[in-house]
Amino acid sequence: MYPYKIAIIDDNQAVLDVLKLTLEEEFESIVTLSHPSFFTPFLSEGEIDAVVLDMNFNSPNLDGAEGINWLRYIKGHPNAPAIVMMTAFGNIDLAVTSLQEGAEDFIVKPWDNKELIKKLLKAIRKNASRQQEKEEIEEAHLLKEQQEAAQQMTLDEMKRKHVMDILDQCKGNLREAAKRLDIN
């Protein structure tokens, strides 16, 4: 069993029931929701690893636009989960748009259970890798800002900082600090 929490969002109760039965055999926890608006509290908690998101919800238009809008909304949050889009009306353009908007994968109803599980696992790994890369980039920017700030210090400021660092290391012991600074 994989230690992941999966959310299934679909307006068809039969689809929710079948997916829950299928996925609870493989994943630690499954949450089913009948509309994406019910997913909002889970975004702030950040505990969902992946979402299977239907493309159409109670809309007369079955073009997937509603699903794409919800995809954008979910992916716009920090630490957004991996998303696998699902629709009965799949086409290449819809799949490409989903991937361009941040979905990790796309699957068409009726689905193959093994294929869906593989896609979810791959999506979780891909999303985790993307999150790690994002964190590393943020850390690099922070380090660069710190280095630039240090480079802008005057010589006197650098000396003062060095003396303060030594004093901190010596826990305020002036004799020890003077010795380390080679002051007689």
Which positions does each model-derived feature cover?
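Acidic, metal-coordinating helix/loop segments flanking the phosphotransfer/catalytic sites
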Residues: 32-50
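Bacterial C-terminal helix-turn-helix
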Residues: 148-184
